[in-house]
């Protein structure tokens, strides 16, 4: 699993970096020729794309390193740090767009030949849609937080390019403030995406529990297993591609230790079949030592 995960995530990061670099060159020429503030917004966003995707590429490779003596749980948290760094990059570009857009609203500047800008934006839109489609497939296969953050970033680019097309079309017909208005709206959306991305990264760094649906699946697996009378203290978190799952099983007092170990091992294998690559720790408790109120699951 780790080899497949590493290959897919690395390819997604390389594809994003290459795409952003190519689009940056095209947008520089288009902005120089047209003077459009919307294209300038897209140009700045491409600079941020390159910085973010390069950060992703380096961090993902680091996060895939195996656990060592100093990092016994692995290096998966590096993905969350990459997502947090991306949110900072994106917030900076959004603030730049705010300032540039307000300046052009106050003093609008007609652009040269909007047709060139429209052509460039159509190319950028098509390329970005292709990239997002590939990233979505990688996220579905790997659940990588770093690639998901990158995908959210490029999804905002799709919306941005669509808005730029409308703005350039309106400017072509003489409404020059449309360019700045749409750039301002794009900046607001980008800032919202950045804040959401940063929130998710911080939650991961704080060891937020797995989603309710996944925890419920773990509960269903454990409670349906023969020989398990109950369970409690389910604790979960995720670091990179690895889920960490801890749970206490309640078993009959007179169950031999060997049999208790066998049941716990079978439960562990069942959880691993559902969540491959997880780190599962199971503790066995005699029913008599578990308080009555502890017989139910406590989702921690």
UniProtKB/Swiss-Prot annotation:
Residues at which Zn(2+) binds: 45, 49, 153, 157
InterPro entries from the UniProt entry: Cation_efflux, Cation_efflux_CTD, Cation_efflux_CTD_sf, Cation_efflux_FieF, Cation_efflux_TMD_sf, CDF_Transporter
Keyword list, A-Z: Cell inner membrane, Cell membrane, Ion transport, Iron, Iron transport, Membrane, Metal-binding, Transmembrane, Transmembrane helix, Transport, Zinc, Zinc transport
Residue stretches spanning the membrane: 24-44, 82-102, 114-134, 156-176, 178-198
Topology within the bilayer: Multi-pass membrane protein
Function of the protein: Divalent metal cation transporter which exports Zn(2+), Cd(2+) and possibly Fe(2+). May be involved in zinc and iron detoxification by efflux.
Name of the protein this chain belongs to: Cation-efflux pump FieF
